Amino acid sequence: MSKRLRSNDVCADCSGPDPSWASVNRGTLICDECCSVHRSLGRHISQVRHLKHTPWPPTLLQMVETLYSNGANSIWEHSLLDPASVMSGRRKANPQDKVHPNKAEFIRAKYQMLAFVHRLPCRDDDSVTAKDLSKQLHSSVRTGNLETCLRLLSLGAQANFFHPEKGSTPLHVASKAGQILQAELLAVYGADPGTHDSSGKTPVDYARQGGHRELAERLVEIQYELTDRLAFYLCGRKPDHKNGQHFIIPQMADSSLDLSELAKAAKKKLQSLSNHLFEELAMDVYDEVDRRETDAVWLATQNHSTLVTETTVVPFLPVNPEYSSTRNQGRQKLARFNAHEFATLVIDILSDAKRRQQGSPLSRSKDNVELILRTVSNQHSTESQDNDQPDYDSVASDEDTDVETRASRTNRQKSLDSDLSDGPVTVQEFMEVKHALVASEAKRQQLMKVNNNLSGELRIMQKKLQTLQSENSSLRRQATASACQVQTASDHKDTVSHSSLKRRPSARGSRPMSMYETGSGQKPYLPMGEANHPEESRTRLQPFPTHIGRSALVTSSSSLPSFPSTLSWSRDESTRRASRLEKQNSTPESDYDNTAYDPEPDDTVSGRKGRQRSMLWQGDGPLPDTAEPHAVPSPALPSTEDVIRKTEQITKNIQELLRAAQENKHDSYIPCSERIHAAVTEMAALFPKKPKSDTVRTSLRLLTASAYRLQSECRKALPGDSSLPTDVQLVTQQVIQCAYDIAKAAKQLVTITTKENSS
């Protein structure tokens, strides 16, 4: 989409060669290092886009290149061009300067503080000055002089200024004159294409009256820029505004939208927001989408050895001082959403934005009648309707696209005409509605029967859970008694052998055998390798059907095995490995917040239990203190050189994966993810099994869990046996997010080891 860069293009901030990024609202081209600082400032200061790897509207790119070639950078460095500035000691950054603090301080002073912009003479009333500047902008946009308009905007002119005498805004004037680049600049600074002038006309109306068709179509795209960007982020498609399609509501590829009561309540709360609050939330989500997409481009284009250098990382949205602290905190919490949660939020916002724009009420009973009639006509045409199909599969929702086929539109109009006509109801129409009601009643009865069965199974599982809790308490008491016996018998060495002591763990050592942790919420600690022996199992809970929500269970695994009644710790190594392999193969693939990592077995039982505990804990906060009594935290950390070498190996493999994603080579996902997983395992092996630092443990947990989650996501990219289509775009976004988490964890480990080894 972007034009070929000229050989004499340099970075506007440090004069470095071959800039590959653009600051849209500043009209400048910048290099990678300066771009990292721009991103840390936030979109309210600088809106950065990659020149080659980001889709550009042609006129927007033309506007940026025109401003850059005509010296727009001199607007932001006006006082530096004055020879007197050399005497004052102020100078521009050089390519050889460090990013921190040299380049970062200069860029903040240039764009955030506007320290080098030409200042007008001071006046007593700033509002009068802004009004005069806005009037000048109103007059200047009818010409093609972009630099003058950008200079006025930099001094405080308002892009949405309504001229009291002429009764219009600058965008009305630019549209009437056919100045499409001026319209792009005004839109970047917040001009609204839907504003009406004193005659009740919008800029789109003036563009169409003047015969400026391209400008009119572009103004419509700008008007729907927010929803278009959100839809493109999820499914890689944009609505066809030329043909009247203004919204696309994507659907989850695996139909895994969260249908829990909490999700439904959140959606109702979203729908109850006022238009003003809903607009603020939508803009915040738009900024988060921009941050995530820019992160993906950044990871795909950078030399990944720079991940351990001083370039700035943007893990969440920067603070905007114009917003309240509550809103800034909410904006930053958006970064904590995983790919599935964020996609669900975006879909809800798109659906409600469409409803609000069309003025549709929350109640849709009339639409339901229409949809019943459409279903009846389909039943008569096919005669083979599947009654086992849930209701929501045959009922359309706000996720339907606006463009429908002519045949379906005609059928709907006929149904509406027959339903809303004032004439008598025919026998055929009466029978159709009657059959539809009978089918609905049959489905309702079937669902009630299924609900009763599930309620019975739930009661059975609750009873089994109580039984397991009582057995758990009994085992704890037995372990405590055994510990007391071991302590008493320790004075009689001739009666107690070393092997018997080894077979009697202490009370604290038996704590990892807990079947159910009441304080761990919905993520219990489930050891591996000890409970997966069918000959020693007492009770095994049956799994819920696949359509039952996660809130009904206390664990996400398919079965809940109990512990053996006798503690036989003397199995041979082959039996333990076979048990672990069986458990690994029986674990179902689930969401990545439930993914378990299975480490290699150690030679001793204590080492194996310690590693299983550290890798399988899925609660919040630090790991629970359930390790062996004699386990001592190891303060030793590997050398910085070894960690950097392993990190470079990881980032090299991530770069290959991102290159495959960029070239749509989905069959390369799994080999790349396996190499990344192997590199992560090698890096994790450098660190002690129980690091002393909580930060190291947290980073290692994030590193290994993200690598395992990456393998799971890469498998989804290959076409499987499922009849549901795979949303490759969404899978790719999730793969990139996992790769970013791995890179972030690796950099954290490099930073920690560097700091610890240098101190």
From Swiss-Prot:
SUPFAM superfamilies: Ankyrin repeat (SSF48403), ArfGap/RecO-like zinc finger (SSF57863). Residues 376-422, 469-641 are annotated as: Disordered. One of its GO terms (molecular function) is small GTPase binding. Residues 570-583 have a biased composition (Basic and acidic residues). Residues 555-569 have a biased composition (Low complexity). Residues 451-478 form a coiled coil. ANK repeats lie at residues 132-161, 166-198, 199-228. It holds the Pfam family ArfGap. One of its GO terms (cellular component) is synapse. Keywords: ANK repeat, Coiled coil, GTPase activation, Metal-binding, Repeat, Zinc, Zinc-finger. Residues 1-124 form the Arf-GAP domain. Residues 385-402 have a biased composition (Acidic residues). May form heterooligomers with GIT1. Directly interacts with protein Piccolo/PCLO. Interacts with PPFIA1 and PPFIA2. Interacts with ARHGEF7. Identified in a complex with ARHGEF6 and BIN2. Interacts with PAK3. Interacts with PXN/paxillin. Interacts with TGFB1I1. Forms a complex with EFNB1 and GRB4/NCK2. This is ARF GTPase-activating protein GIT2. It comes from Rattus norvegicus (Rat).
